[in-house]
Design a protein with these regions (language model features):
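Long hydrophobic alpha-helical segments typical of transmembrane helices together
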Residues: 167-196
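Conserved Nudix-box catalytic region and its N-terminal flanking loop in Nudix hydrolases
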Residues: 2-4, 14-16, 48, 67-105
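Short beta-strand micro-motifs in enzyme catalytic cores
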Residues: 32-36, 70, 134-136, 157
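Acidic, metal-coordinating catalytic segment for phosphate/diphosphate chemistry
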Residues: 21-60
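Extreme N-terminal tail/first-helix region
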Residues: 1-27
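Unchanged
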Residues: 46, 56-58, 63, 92-178
Length: 196
């Protein structure tokens, strides 16, 4: 059966939904959930359940003291995924905190590392179909190691992994975390382009 050809969205598709009502149905420590009644641009009324989150920061910490860059990866158990995952250091932005301040705090808390040079290199939505969480990936360079202060419920192993090995871990299916995949691939492409 031939597939239907899709045409490009018309300008009218850019209209914003009209929120008719919004009710918080859950409020927790990390996120809340709202059930919103909205009117679509075509006039249809629908219910949208949205997980509300303050946003997250991700730290692409790179050690450049050797022959090739090494990426700081963490290995920790994630209850929701029910497995140990390789990730970049990351965390939630606290109320009233800037993304950069949150990134600096999370890097120290989780790993003990500090960085002298910071630059936001990526910004994206984690899963925009039902979640408003944004993620900012910060490149952190010129690292020095101090003492970590992870939260009581965090058990994190830190590893400096050569970039080629981190790429192999992605392409061999050992890294399942989307933000880690995005950050490591960004670094490899930035180096390839001469932008690093």
């Amino acid at each position: 059966m031939p597939s239907k050809k899709r045409s490009a969205p018309k300008k009218s598709a850019k209209k914003v939904l009209k929120v008719l009502s919004s009710k918080t149905v859950y409020k927790g420590k990390v996120f809340s959930v709202t059930s919103d009644k909205v009117q679509e641009p075509n006039g249809v009324t629908a219910t949208r359940d949205v997980i509300r989150h303050s946003g997250s920061v991700v730290i692409l910490a790179v050690d450049e003291t050797g022959d090739e860059p090494r990426v700081l990866l963490e290995r920790q158990y994630r209850y929701a995924a029910q497995e140990y995952l390789w990730e970049l250091p990351a965390g939630r932005i606290d109320p009233g905190e800037s993304a950069l301040a949150g990134a600096k705090r999370e890097l120290i808390e989780e790993t003990g590392y500090r960085a002298k040079k910071w630059k936001r290199v990526l910004f994206f939505y984690a899963s925009p179909g039902f979640l408003n969480e944004t993620m900012s990936i910060f490149l952190a360079r010129d690292l020095t190691l101090g003492e970590a202060a992870p939260e009581e419920d965090e058990s994190i192993e830190c590893h400096l992994v050569p970039l080629p090995e981190a790429l192999d871990m992605i392409f061999n299916g050992k890294i399942h975390d989307g933000k880690a995949i995005a950050g490591v691939l960004w670094l490899a492409e930035a180096i390839r382009r001469g932008d690093f």
